[in-house]
Curated annotation (Swiss-Prot):
It comes from the Bacteria. Probable serine/threonine kinase. Transmembrane segments: none annotated. Autophosphorylated. The gene is yegI. Its EC number is 2.7.-.-. This is Protein kinase YegI. It comes from Escherichia coli O157:H7. Keywords: ATP-binding, Kinase, Nucleotide-binding, Phosphoprotein, Transferase. It is an enzyme of class 2 (transferase).
Length: 646
C-alpha cells in the first residue's frame, strides 16, 4: 500500500495504480480524484523546483487546464513537508501526436482521418502555445513527445513542469531540449543550463510541429543535398537555415525529398509563414506567433473542398486539382479511401447517349491564318564593303589559279612580282569570307527563331480552334470511352490478382506494424530516424536498400543495419492461407473501380459537351492570338528576305 500524500491545503491524496514511469518520476492514479493523476518524483526536487511547482499550482486557471496538463496542487509527504510531486489533469483517450502526423501510424490507428482533421490538430497545437505565451511562460523543450491528441482533435501539452515559468519576475528556466526541434540560432549552445528561452524560440518548434502535421511527418530541414556538405546532420542543416522547401532552396543547398507533399498545396500567405519561421528573417524580425498561426489555420479551414473521386481527399480551395490524387498516381498514399463514401455517378449516365453527342459534333472549318507569303518585305542589304557569296567564289577561283601559277616560279623567276599581289588577294578573300560567314550565321539564327515563334503560335491556334485540336480532343474522348468499356474486365482481373498477391500483401501489412521510431537500430538515433521519415521510410515495409541509401548520412554500414532490422522483422512473418483475401480487400478493389468509373464518366460527359461547342467557341479562343500570329508571320517573312540577300 502506497503512503498517503497531502496537498498544500492539507487534503489527503492516495496514489493508486502506476500508469507510467520515467527518469524523473512516476505517474499514478489518485483514489480520491478520478479525473486527476499524481506525478511523484523519485527524489524530492531542489528548493527552486519546489517553488516553481508551488507557483504553477497557485496560478492554474481554466484556460491553462484546457490545453496543458498543468499542476493543480503540490503534493507533500506530510502536512507542511517538502514538495515531492503534484496533481494534474488526467490525460485519457489521447495518443502521442506522431500517431496522427505519421502516415503509417495514421493509416492503422486513424484511417478515417483526412487532411481537414490534421489541419484542426495543427490549429489546436498553435492554440496551446498561445495559451502558454499569454500567461507569460515559454514551453522551452518543444518536441513531439510533449503533445497528446484525441480523436476529437483536442491537443494537450504534457511535461509542463519542464516549462520556463515566469513567477512574477522570477524566471524558472527550462534547461533541456531536443536537437532537431532547436532553432538555428541556438544550435551551437553547449547546453541550455542558465539560458533564458523566448517565445520566438518556441515559435520555431511550433512551426516545425505544424509542418510535421500538415506534411506527413516530414522535417523541413531534411531533403536531397544540392551541395557536398548538406544533409550530413540534421542539426547542422538547421544551424545553416537549409530549409528544403524554401523558395530559394537552390541557394540553401537542400531540396525536398522525392514524392513529398508540395508546399504549393498551401495558400501563399501560409507558405510565407513557413518561410519566415525557418529562415534568417525569423531570427531578425521574429517568427509567426502562435496567435498568427491560429488565425491563419482557422481561415484555411474555411476554404477547404473535397475531391469528387475520394471523400478522404480534402484540400485547400485555391487548388484546381486534387493534390492527393496526384500523389496517389505516384504511388504515395497519404489517405486510405475505405470505399464507404465514394461519390458515385448519377444514374442517368448512358454511354451510348454521351457518345452520340461526341459523334454528332461538327468539326470547325479550316482556319484562315496569316502566312509569311502574304508579306513582300525588302531584305536588308549586306553591310558596306561585304562581298556577296558569288564574289567570294570568284576570289577563291582566282586564288586557286594564282596558286597554280606560282608552281612555275622556279622555272620563270620573272613571275616573282606576282607574290605580293597573291598575298593581298588571299588576305582580302580570307577576311571577307569570315565576316560573311558571321553575317549569314546571324541571319540564319534570326530566321530560325522567327520560324519557331510562328510555328508555335500556329500550333496553339490549331489546338484551340482548328481541326487538329478538334481531332485531338475527340481521340482523347474515344480513349475514355474504351476505358469505361474495359472496366468490368479490369475489375475482374484485379479481384483475381488478390489471390496471386495474397502472401505479399499479408507480409506487407505485417511489416507495416514495425515502426522505425520504436526500433533499436545500431547507429540510428532520433535525428537519423527523422531523416528517414522525411524520405517516407517509417516502417519495415518501407525499407529498401536503394531507398535508405538515398538518405544522406546512410552509407553501407548504416544502410545494412536498417536492412538487417527489416530482415529480423520478416523472420517473424507467418502466412495465413485462410485469410488470403478478406472482404475489406475485395471492397477496396471495387471501390477503386467505382471511383475510376465516376472519374471517367464525369470527364467524358464534360468532354462531350465541350466538343459540341468547339466549333462555336473557336473564334473567341483563337482571336486573341491572331494579331500576334500576323506579327510573327511578318517577322518571319522579313527574316527570310534578309537571308536571301546573302
Amino acid at each position: 500500500m502506497k503512503p498517503t500524500l497531502y496537498t498544500a491545503t492539507g487534503e489527503c491524496v492516495t496514489p493508486g495504480r502506476e500508469l507510467g514511469k520515467g527518469g524523473e518520476g512516476a505517474v499514478y492514479d489518485i483514489n480520491e480524484f478520478v479525473d486527476s493523476v499524481a506525478k511523484i518524483y523519485h527524489t524530492p526536487p531542489p528548493a527552486l523546483k519546489q517553488d516553481k511547482l508551488a507557483f504553477m499550482a497557485a496560478t492554474a486557471d481554466a484556460q491553462l487546464l484546457n490545453y496543458v496538463a498543468w499542476p493543480q496542487a503540490t503534493l507533500h509527504g506530510g502536512r507542511g513537508g517538502k514538495v515531492i510531486g503534484f496533481m494534474m489533469p488526467k490525460v485519457s483517450g489521447k495518443e502521442p501526436i506522431h500517431m496522427i502526423y505519421s502516415p503509417a501510424h495514421r493509416r492503422q490507428s486513424y484511417p478515417h482521418c483526412a487532411w481537414d482533421f490534421l489541419l484542426y490538430v495543427a490549429r489546436n497545437i498553435a492554440s496551446s502555445f498561445a495559451t502558454v505565451h499569454e500567461h507569460g511562460h515559454v514551453v522551452g523543450d518543444v518536441n513531439q513527445n510533449s503533445f497528446m491528441v484525441g480523436r476529437d482533435s483536442k491537443v494537450v501539452l504534457i511535461d509542463s513542469d519542464s516549462f520556463q515559468i515566469n513567477a512574477n519576475g522570477t524566471l524558472h528556466l527550462c534547461e533541456v531540449g531536443v536537437s532537431h526541434f532547436t532553432p538555428p540560432e541556438l544550435q551551437t549552445l553547449p547546453s541550455f543550463v542558465g539560458f533564458e528561452r523566448t517565445a520566438n524560440h518556441d515559435n520555431f518548434g511550433l512551426a516545425l510541429l505544424i509542418f510535421h502535421v500538415l506534411f506527413g511527418g516530414r522535417h523541413p530541414y531534411s531533403g536531397v543535398p544540392l551541395i557536398s556538405d548538406a544533409g550530413n546532420a540534421l542539426e547542422t542543416d538547421i544551424a545553416h537555415f537549409r530549409y528544403a522547401y524554401a523558395s530559394d532552396n537552390q541557394r540553401r543547398g537542400l531540396k525536398p525529398p522525392p514524392r513529398s507533399i508540395p508546399l504549393s498545396m498551401l495558400p501563399g500567405d501560409v507558405e510565407a509563414m513557413f518561410q519566415q519561421a525557418f529562415t534568417e528573417s525569423g531570427v531578425a524580425t521574429a517568427r509567426p506567433t502562435a496567435k498568427a498561426w491560429v488565425a491563419a489555420l482557422d481561415l484555411l479551414r474555411q476554404q477547404l473542398k473535397k475531391c469528387t473521386v475520394s471523400a478522404m481527399h480534402v484540400y485547400p480551395g485555391h487548388l484546381t486539382d486534387c493534390p492527393w490524387c496526384a500523389l496517389d498516381n505516384q504511388g504515395v498514399i497519404y489517405f486510405i479511401d475505405l470505399g464507404e463514401e465514394v461519390i458515385t455517378t448519377s444514374g442517368d449516365f448512358v454511354l451510348a447517349k454521351v457518345w452520340a453527342m461526341v459523334m454528332a459534333s461538327v468539326a470547325p472549318p479550316a482556319l484562315q491564318l496569316p502566312l509569311p507569303d502574304h508579306f513582300q518585305p525588302t531584305g536588308r542589304p549586306l553591310p558596306l564593303g561585304l562581298l556577296r557569296r558569288e564574289y567570294i567564289i570568284l576570289i577563291e577561283i582566282a586564288l586557286s589559279a594564282l596558286s597554280l601559277l606560282l608552281c612555275g616560279l622556279q622555272a620563270e623567276p620573272r613571275y616573282i612580282i606576282l607574290v605580293p599581289v597573291l598575298a593581298a588577294i588571299w588576305i582580302i578573300g580570307s577576311l571577307t569570307s569570315k565576316v560573311y560567314k558571321a553575317e549569314i550565321q546571324q541571319r540564319r539564327e534570326a530566321f530560325n527563331r522567327a520560324k519557331m515563334d510562328y510555328d508555335h503560335l500556329v500550333s496553339q491556334i490549331q489546338q484551340l480552334g482548328g481541326l487538329e485540336g478538334f481531332i485531338a480532343k475527340r481521340a482523347m474522348l474515344e480513349k475514355m470511352k474504351d476505358e469505361i468499356l474495359g472496366l468490368p474486365e479490369e475489375e475482374k482481373r484485379a479481384l483475381a490478382a488478390l489471390h496471386d498477391t495474397a502472401r505479399e500483401r499479408q507480409k506487407q501489412k505485417f511489416l507495416e506494424g514495425f515502426f522505425i521510431d520504436a526500433a533499436s537500430i545500431p547507429g540510428v538515433g532520433p535525428a537519423r530516424k527523422a531523416a528517414l521519415r522525411s524520405f517516407g521510410i517509417e516502417t519495415a515495409a518501407d525499407v529498401t536498400r536503394r531507398g535508405v541509401k538515398q538518405v544522406k548520412g546512410f552509407g553501407d554500414h548504416l544502410t545494412q543495419a536498417v536492412i538487417d532490422w527489416k530482415a529480423s522483422c520478416e523472420r517473424r512473418f507467418v502466412f495465413r492461407p485462410n485469410e488470403a483475401v478478406t472482404p475489406a480487400e475485395r471492397q477496396a478493389v471495387m471501390a477503386k473501380m467505382a471511383a475510376k468509373r465516376h472519374r471517367l464518366e464525369s470527364a467524358l460527359t464534360v468532354g462531350a459537351t465541350e466538343l459540341q461547342r468547339f466549333r462555336l467557341h473557336a473564334p473567341a479562343r483563337t482571336m486573341p492570338l491572331m494579331e500576334p500570329l500576323r506579327q510573327a508571320a511578318e517577322k518571319l517573312a522579313q527574316a527570310q528576305a534578309d537571308l536571301s540577300r546573302c
